Swiss-Prot record:
The gene is L1. Self-assembles into homopentamers. The capsid has an icosahedral symmetry and consists of 72 capsomers, with each capsomer being a pentamer of L1. Interacts with the minor capsid protein L2; this interaction is necessary for viral genome encapsidation. This is Major capsid protein L1. The keyword Thylakoid does not apply. It comes from Bos taurus papillomavirus 6 (Bovine papillomavirus 6). Belongs to the papillomaviridae L1 protein family. GO terms for biological process: symbiont entry into host cell; virion attachment to host cell. Keywords: Capsid protein, Host-virus interaction, Late protein, Viral attachment to host cell, Virion, Virus entry into host cell.
Amino acid sequence: YLRHVEEWELSCIMQLCIVDLKPETLAHLHNMDPRILETWNLGFIQPPTNIEDQYRFIKSLATKCPGKEETAEKEDPYAKYKFWDINLTERFSSNWNMYLGRNFLFQIGKRGSKRPAPKTVTFDSSSKKAPKRRRKNA
């Protein structure tokens, strides 16, 4: 039983979205894990809470002697864990109609190619009708 390998075929639906990088969002990400924003090159600086913090992060040659910059590689916090290897290169598709049924697309709000019903237009006739013309008998 030690050599028995199971192979699973999973179907996942990925819904991608765009998140605005507002200060509140960046502060939330920074509080979760400060290493997330370090490689994004956003220029996000944590707001100083007291006067020591205000001068601690200044990187100017006028305020301190320049030290040797260490370019040590950052350690991956998840390197000791083993996750699944999933290859999505051939199967990832944005064409949902081909893979999913209409009922499922309706449930998540994607309605397919049907157009909405036309709106009915009514005119409010508050004035009296114009009198009919008399016809001459020819």
